[in-house]
Amino acid sequence: MRGISLWVCGPGRRAANADRTGKGISVLPTSYDLVLAYAHDYFSSRVRELCGQFDLSFFLVEPIWATEFVHKLQAGEVKVRVLIDMASDAYLPDDPYFTLAKTVKQLGGYVIDDPDAGAMMGDKSKFHRLLVDHNIPVPETVIVTRSDLDSFCLTEAMLAQVGLPFVVKPGWGSGRQGVILDGQSEADLRQSAAAVPYSDAFLLQRKITPKSLEGRVAWFRVFHIFGEVIPCWWHPTTGDYQLVTPLEERRFKLQPLTRIMKDIARVSKIHFFSSEITLTAEKRFFVIDYLNTECDMSAKSFWPSGVPDELARHVAWVLVDHAMAVAKRRRGPFDDELMQRDQDWLERQRQSGQAPRE
């Protein structure tokens, strides 16, 4: 195994190179202003570039050395001021990125987003009840616990509530694992339970049919990032993204997307996430996929189903800008630091006889 070469942006810009003995990381700065838990090249390169511009030390934790970085962090050899978590999976108990996020938080670092809040909101059955309590529009749902699976029987009242066919979703799980879109009976529920053995609850939901808006499916993936809401057209089958323009938002009366996303952010306490929301022929909005905390920022120029490039660039900017405010504050007052730099420069100029005249 060859050593790993790590490049650092920011103060004291230097290469932190691994030795060539196969022992992995051998030289690391004491502290990083910003650490990015793995993202695709386009997005991570943009974050790295911005860190260089803002004078922030930066490290990208790629999968090959995620576990080793956690060990260095736990041993006190590395410190992290801000972690942007784009990769952790709370549904996997041994996921190194989730361990990284929890370790950074435990050691006093700032994590975007809080791993404990993300894990708590990741339980769809519990989060569903929370959304209902706060009047956030979600499909009609019947929640079934795993302990009730053997005795569970769909009643006429339940079928009247969720309709046929209905959607089956595991309460705990990521991606589409265990999701059944054309459920007909208890057998589909048990099939979902077998596919996701670690989920303790399951949701039977009314299947929502989106309306068409001038040939476009009224299905949206909407991003929330520190109070800013960015809606996108998103096709649930092809995964194709297009930004919703201000004109389209006014023309199709899509303003409720912003209100719904801000309500979800308020309830969940999560800063950076996406949700799937659809609009029906009855002009009703429904949140379909409640909360995705590890947003995929793969760019459309590289991946057909990726997000628009301008969205990826903007998200990188907002995240780094927020991280800079936190990192500079933890270094010391930002204005005082700038003032000291100016004084140091003036003193050097005076000593060289080139000080500006007053």
Task: Identify what each model region corresponds to.
Residues 39-149:
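Conserved N-proximal alpha/beta basic substrate-recognition cap immediately N-terminal to
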Residues 131-132, 158-177, 199-214:
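ATP-grasp fold ATP-binding core
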Residues 141, 166-192:
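Glycine-rich phosphate-binding loop of ATP-grasp-fold ATP-dependent ligases
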Residues 141-163:
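Rossmann-like NAD(P)H-binding beta-loop-alpha module
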Residues 181-268:
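Phosphate-binding site of ATP-dependent enzymes
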Residues 270-282:
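A short glycine-rich, hydrophobically flanked beta-strand micro-motif that places a catalytic Asp/Glu
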Residues 279-358:
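C-terminal active-site "lid" helix and adjoining low-complexity regulatory extension at the edge
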